[in-house]
Amino acid sequence: MTLLTSSLLLFSLLTSRLEAIPVLEKSPAHPAHSAHPAHPAHPAHPAHPSPGVRILRAPESLVAPLGDEVVLECETSLQPERFEWSHRSSRSPGAGFKYLKTGTAKANVSQEAAISRLRVLVRPDTLGEYRCVGWFGPLVVTSTIARLELASTSLVDAQESESPLQWRVSAGNSVLWSCGQQVQSNPSASWSYYRNGVEIKPEFIGTNGNLFLSNVSSESSGSYSCQATNPASGERIQLPGSLQLQVTPEQRSESKSPHLLRGQPSSQEITIREGSSLLLLCPGVGSPPPTVVWSSPDVVGAVKNKRSKVFGHALEISNTRVNDAGTYICFQDNGVRPALEHYIKVHVEQPPQIVRPPWADLTNEGDRLKLECKATGVPTPEIYWLLNGHSSIDDSEAELSNNFLILHSVLKRHAGYVQCFARNRLGEHSAGTLLQVNPKQIQEPRESGGTHRPKPNQGSRQKQMYPPTPPNVTRLSDESVMLRWMVPRNDGLPIVIFKVQYRMVGKRKNWQTTNDNIPYGKPKWNSELGKSFTASVTDLKPQHTYRFRILAVYSNNDNKESNTSAKFYLQPGAALDPMPVPELLEIEEYSETAVVLHWSLASDADEHLITGYYAYYRPSSSAGEYFKATIEGAHARSFKIAPLETATMYEFKLQSFSAASASEFSALKQGRTQRPKTSTTEEPTLQMGDRDTTTPSHNETFNMSPMLTGTIGGGAVLILLLISTCFCVCRRRNSRSRGNNPNKPRMAELRDDFVPLGNCSPTKQRQRTRHIHITLNPLAQQQQQALEEKNDTDQDAPYYQRPSSYDYDPTLRRMSSSSLRRSQRTLERAGGSNGSNNGNNNNLNQSAEAGSIENPGKPGRVLMKRPRLSSRSENLSSGSLNSVGV
């Protein structure tokens, strides 16, 4: 990657909040030849959630002899774009680190995937401190320091120890000889002990040059010597001093109080590393041999605990802790006064450990930023900072104050990875955070002069199109990733939709655009920083590197692209450690449009691997796509999701994520929003000039109480019944009005007059149904035959009408329609007779005679029409009817 490309990428960092990237402490390396670790590595304790880009194995400090070749190894969680190594010579400890040129005679760098190896020839100019630097796009991650030291062994004050020691003790005593006090070795020497020139096995290991003989006897008498060996160089040193020990029988010895022998220390001071085993040895002899009691005024329960063991003159404490530091007293008493007290001062050193890592949010350019880094360790660790691999001491805007880094004015060049290092003589520990810088918006320059006056026909200045931030990429599966981006707060043109574009890194690789339109949603900001969005991209190829960008489409149908993301290498899932899976505990009904998710992690889950969580939700009745929400921070255990539909059941699932991968989904869990609450509070009356601008939501518009619904339904039924009643009454009145027409044909009259009213009457009266039985007169058949013959010869005969006389029965209510039709035909036939019917029907005869007189010139065709009856109950007992029975 060229310097220009690196600079451009530095201004377009990942925008979603990435938590600190802990640099794990050193794990055992594979030194070449006789190289040995200078200090054992302390356990790794990641101090903060990691986005997946971190140092898995930092180079380890080594001690090697001159002319040897050593190998420093560095491994990262993801394959970087490139590795670099820097060096600071031990000849100039105050100087800064310088990047090494690879391929030289004294340093050779090789890379295999995510592992880089530096081969160094041990020379005086190659001794010093080394760092491994991994480049991940705009991010620069630096490892902790590895020291390369020269193996050495030397004697101190050798002349004073040339004369041999001569001790005479009674049998049964324990003897402590410190033969290695004059030796200085790097690394610590290993010891061998000899009696009369024959090597003997010591009772305790790790005595650091102290020979301890317990319960001596006459067989223990002899000449003792010791030898130190450097484990790195193999160099051996035979100490000139020796011990002549003479053991006498206890019966021949006179009584003596406990006392120290010549050359034995009156007090001791021991320094040990936390986690190691501590062995305290008590010097002193007496006659008879004294009894030893151990105690400590500083450490409560120092002797009587599971980690402590007493072996007479020896006290062993395993897995030493910091609170084990203090003064220990060895009290010796044999009944002869005075008793002997021996004091041993114990110091427990602790490697540095960062307990409060730095944390940086999105910071505006020009703002003041204060980062804190708190660490523990014995001795108290020194804190220093790196900004994208460069020391903060060289930055003019940076100030160091105790555990704080203060940037008085955040600039674009500060964007990147900020690391805090805690250092003491036992080693280093590191943690970092991603510093995101929101650049200042460049305003269009105005014309110089006084008040700006718009030119004629010049419209208002168009709003700017503010692009979204570069997306942050998280692996979801072997073929898909999740993108997160943000639209910073602005007053520019509103965004309508987003499109996601991606391309595979390589020559002649074009940008691909996904088919999905990602809506902007409601025009409001989710937080003070802006509004965040997420989208997934599928159908990718594993073990390939991609870049992503976001295309924003604005309300003026124009579009603008975000800066491209950093290179993202899509690793297969088999190469990644599984992420902790969250467990959904409860879906709390928060309000009518919101719920709160509550979840937990397993007790053995490593929370430091998590950057945040993805929440997926959709209505339970839907089989469509899930809505997504991003929850930042590994410590989050609850999250409110809104807005949702009122009184609707939803299903939810969670997964944790980091920049490298995402976990499996949690089990589905259902929950619902609250039902609407009925309120009896009266709405305030709007005054003149006031207007209620509240717009009800979709759910509130159609949400009615059951009582109101029943009232409206009952009213609708009553209205329908009233309309039906009115319709029947009107129809009855129309039937009556049609019956009063004198010119209406007789067939229609009879139908209308005898239409039953029982079907449409609102109130039905219970009355006995009256049946009318009509029997035709035999004379009517003869009259009908004569009438038909006349009709054939005379088609134009006029009609004459004479009122007919009927008996009226006011109690008659109903009549059979079929009987009425037969009666009608009978009456019409009877009207055509000649009137000589022997007086059976006087009314008909009168009508016929009247008709002949009024029209003498016409043939005698007479049709009798009955006038309108005054009631629906009639007694047809005259004319051509023979009998009427009711």
Curated annotation (Swiss-Prot):
<keyword id="KW-0732">Signal</keyword>
<dbReference type="GO" id="GO:0015026">
    <property type="term" value="F:coreceptor activity"/>
</dbReference>
<dbReference type="GO" id="GO:0035222">
    <property type="term" value="P:wing disc pattern formation"/>
</dbReference>
<feature type="compositionally biased region" description="Polar residues">
    <location>
        <begin position="671"/>
        <end position="684"/>
    </location>
</feature>
<feature type="compositionally biased region" description="Low complexity">
    <location>
        <begin position="870"/>
        <end position="886"/>
    </location>
</feature>
<feature type="binding site">
    <location>
        <position position="507"/>
    </location>
    <ligand>
        <name>heparin</name>
    </ligand>
</feature>
<dbReference type="GO" id="GO:0007411">
    <property type="term" value="P:axon guidance"/>
</dbReference>
<feature type="glycosylation site" description="N-linked (GlcNAc...) asparagine">
    <location>
        <position position="472"/>
    </location>
</feature>
<feature type="region of interest" description="Disordered">
    <location>
        <begin position="668"/>
        <end position="697"/>
    </location>
</feature>
<feature type="disulfide bond">
    <location>
        <begin position="282"/>
        <end position="330"/>
    </location>
</feature>
<dbReference type="GO" id="GO:0007224">
    <property type="term" value="P:smoothened signaling pathway"/>
</dbReference>
<feature type="region of interest" description="Disordered">
    <location>
        <begin position="734"/>
        <end position="768"/>
    </location>
</feature>
<dbReference type="GO" id="GO:0005886">
    <property type="term" value="C:plasma membrane"/>
</dbReference>
<dbReference type="GO" id="GO:0007379">
    <property type="term" value="P:segment specification"/>
</dbReference>
<dbReference type="InterPro" id="IPR036179">
    <property type="entry name" value="Ig-like_dom_sf"/>
</dbReference>
<dbReference type="InterPro" id="IPR007110">
    <property type="entry name" value="Ig-like_dom"/>
</dbReference>
<dbReference type="GO" id="GO:0034109">
    <property type="term" value="P:homotypic cell-cell adhesion"/>
</dbReference>
<protein>
    <recommendedName>
        <fullName>Interference hedgehog</fullName>
    </recommendedName>
</protein>
<dbReference type="InterPro" id="IPR036116">
    <property type="entry name" value="FN3_sf"/>
</dbReference>
<dbReference type="GO" id="GO:0016020">
    <property type="term" value="C:membrane"/>
</dbReference>
<feature type="domain" description="Ig-like C2-type 4">
    <location>
        <begin position="352"/>
        <end position="438"/>
    </location>
</feature>
<dbReference type="GO" id="GO:0035017">
    <property type="term" value="P:cuticle pattern formation"/>
</dbReference>
<feature type="domain" description="Fibronectin type-III 2">
    <location>
        <begin position="581"/>
        <end position="676"/>
    </location>
</feature>
<feature type="disulfide bond">
    <location>
        <begin position="373"/>
        <end position="420"/>
    </location>
</feature>
<dbReference type="InterPro" id="IPR003599">
    <property type="entry name" value="Ig_sub"/>
</dbReference>
<dbReference type="GO" id="GO:0042803">
    <property type="term" value="F:protein homodimerization activity"/>
</dbReference>
<dbReference type="Pfam" id="PF00041">
    <property type="entry name" value="fn3"/>
</dbReference>
<feature type="topological domain" description="Extracellular">
    <location>
        <begin position="21"/>
        <end position="709"/>
    </location>
</feature>
<feature type="disulfide bond">
    <location>
        <begin position="179"/>
        <end position="226"/>
    </location>
</feature>
<feature type="domain" description="Fibronectin type-III 1">
    <location>
        <begin position="467"/>
        <end position="573"/>
    </location>
</feature>
<feature type="binding site">
    <location>
        <position position="503"/>
    </location>
    <ligand>
        <name>heparin</name>
    </ligand>
</feature>
<feature type="glycosylation site" description="N-linked (GlcNAc...) asparagine">
    <location>
        <position position="699"/>
    </location>
</feature>
<comment type="function">
    <text>Mediates response to the active Hedgehog (Hh) protein signal in embryos, functioning upstream or at the level of patched (ptc).</text>
</comment>
<comment type="similarity">
    <text>Belongs to the immunoglobulin superfamily. IHOG family.</text>
</comment>
<feature type="compositionally biased region" description="Low complexity">
    <location>
        <begin position="829"/>
        <end position="843"/>
    </location>
</feature>
<dbReference type="GO" id="GO:0098609">
    <property type="term" value="P:cell-cell adhesion"/>
</dbReference>
<dbReference type="GO" id="GO:0042802">
    <property type="term" value="F:identical protein binding"/>
</dbReference>
<feature type="domain" description="Ig-like C2-type 3">
    <location>
        <begin position="258"/>
        <end position="346"/>
    </location>
</feature>
<feature type="compositionally biased region" description="Low complexity">
    <location>
        <begin position="29"/>
        <end position="38"/>
    </location>
</feature>
<feature type="domain" description="Ig-like C2-type 2">
    <location>
        <begin position="138"/>
        <end position="238"/>
    </location>
</feature>
<comment type="subunit">
    <text>Homodimer. Heterotetramer; 2 iHog chains bind 2 hh chains when facilitated by heparin, heparin is required to promote high-affinity interactions between hh and iHog.</text>
</comment>
<dbReference type="InterPro" id="IPR013783">
    <property type="entry name" value="Ig-like_fold"/>
</dbReference>
